[in-house]
């Protein structure tokens, strides 16, 4: 059975990051992990206040789908379960990563894309 874990992580920046609307000295990331005892799929997101997201609200959205993830929620089902945003991004990435590891197939291959190559 799959389980879902998620947490808020704070990373200090090496130096102050400044753009026209402000400065910040740290970045806040919400991580999601889907585990089954053998495989772990990981995803992350950066909540954006512009879209009324806080780290806590995004974490709550992710955690609310714990029972659905345990029941086998697919990437397609996720699209209907959450609106576009940071939480859906983190879980979508975690599901892609989980499926890739479980099937021992790279994500690019699952998506029907060409193998990545240097630019």
Q: Which stretches of residues belong to each language-model region?
A:
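N-terminal capping/lid subdomain adjacent to the active-site entrance of alpha/beta enzymes
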Residues: 1-119
